Every structure is written in C-alpha cells, then in structure tokens.
Amino acid sequence: MGQKTNPIGLRLGINKNWRSRWFINYNTMPENVLGDYELRKFLKKKLYYAGISDIIIERTAKKIRITIFAAKPGIIIGKGGSEIEALKAELQKRIGNKELILNIKEERKPQLSAQLAAENVATQIERRVAFRRAMKKVIQSALKSGAKGIKVQVAGRLNGAEMARTEWYLEGRVPLHTLRAKIDYGFAEALTTYGIIGVKVWIFKGEVLQRKMNSDDTATPERKAPRRRKGRRNVNAKKN
C-alpha cells in the first residue's frame, strides 16, 4: 500500500500532522472542509510566485489562524507590510466575522520541499524545457541540500507524443513502506499545448525514531515459577 497511497496521509499521527486542525460539530464539518479548500486554492493562486510550500489552517469558535510557509516571504509581506495588510483584508471578507490571525513563516530549505520541487518541474515544462533536464536538475539540488533520496515522476503526452506515458527518476532511497521514514510528497500540473502533464515528487529526509516507551510498557510479562511446597519430599511414599 505504500506505493499507492499518499505518503503524507499514510503517516498522519506518526511523523506527520494534519494541515487542517479544528474540532467542531458534525453538522458544520462539510462547510469547514469546503472553506479550507477554498482558502488554500485562493492563497496558492494569489501567492504563486512566493513559493508556497504548505498552508496550515486552525479553527476555533471565534478565531481562524492561517500559517503560510513560503520560500519568498518578502513577496507576501511587501514593502512596509502593505501587501500583507491587503491580503488580510481579502481573507477577512472570505471568513466573515471571525477573528483572523495570519502568520508568515520562511521555508528555510526550499530544495527539500516536495511541493516546491514539483511546481518547479511543472514551470520548466511549461517553458518548453526538456522534462528530463528539469527532473535531473531538481534531483541534484535536493541531494545537495541533504536529502537521503528523491523520486520524480511525470505523466502525460511528454514531448507532444500521441500516446501518454509515465517516466520517473529515482536517486538514493525512498522507502514508502517504512512508516517511520520522513517522506515529503508534492504534486503539480503543467499546462501545455498538448494537454496536462502531471508531476509527482517524493523526498526522503531520513528516519524519525519514536519516543522511547516506558520500561513498564516494553517489558515482557515474566512467567511465574510454580510454587514449591515447603518441607522435604517423602521419597518412600512412591515405593509403597
């Protein structure tokens, strides 16, 4: 199943956390799920050139906290904070009367972000760069930044071929079945004259060891030895 499922969803609760965090009534869940989707779609489109690697949305009864991880946070903030104030005003119209808390954080190693790597490959394909060259360039930059392994896959009418096909490159290790492996996953689409080309990227950053359990939890139950009767055995009883 590791080869088929989304590696982020497969590792939720192990070494990955949810991107939408809230506890609400069951009846209002569809509304909030749709609201989070619309907010992410709006932010990704508006802040595309800022290099958005992740968006985390936290909701309470009266507040919404949005944390944006970007490779170029200066584009979002703007000169003197003018751009971020305009962004807050647009987001406030979308969320209504709830209090908005907007945090902008810098992606310290954008080369190790699978989402940014996938968008980079898609952008180069749209600019008519050879897809193999774009894939190899992303792989080299990720390995130089400390990645243990990376896999890049493209699918579609590559180079304008009549029949769609899938090609991929793999460097290093990408253990998708190992749940303790810290694997980042990203997906992007390249819009070309021949159709849409899908790009998927898996980046293996190392293994995350779980916290050591208490000695009481890990100790195996010991077998109790049978109790021996006190006193000497009557050897002559069997003979008689």
Curated annotation (Swiss-Prot):
SUPFAM superfamilies, sorted: Prokaryotic type KH domain (KH-domain type II) (SSF54814), Ribosomal protein S3 C-terminal domain (SSF54821)
Transmembrane regions: none
Domain of life where this protein originates: Bacteria
Record's compositionally biased regions (Basic and acidic residues): 213-224
Protein's UniProt keywords contain Transmembrane: no
GO biological process: translation
Gene Ontology CC: one annotated term: cytosolic small ribosomal subunit
Keywords: Ribonucleoprotein, Ribosomal protein, RNA-binding, rRNA-binding
Function: Binds the lower part of the 30S subunit head. Binds mRNA in the 70S ribosome, positioning it for translation.
PANTHER family: 30S/40S RIBOSOMAL PROTEIN S3 (PTHR11760), SMALL RIBOSOMAL SUBUNIT PROTEIN US3C (PTHR11760:SF19)
Family: Belongs to the universal ribosomal protein uS3 family.
Subunit structure: Part of the 30S ribosomal subunit. Forms a tight complex with proteins S10 and S14.
Protein's recorded name: Small ribosomal subunit protein uS3
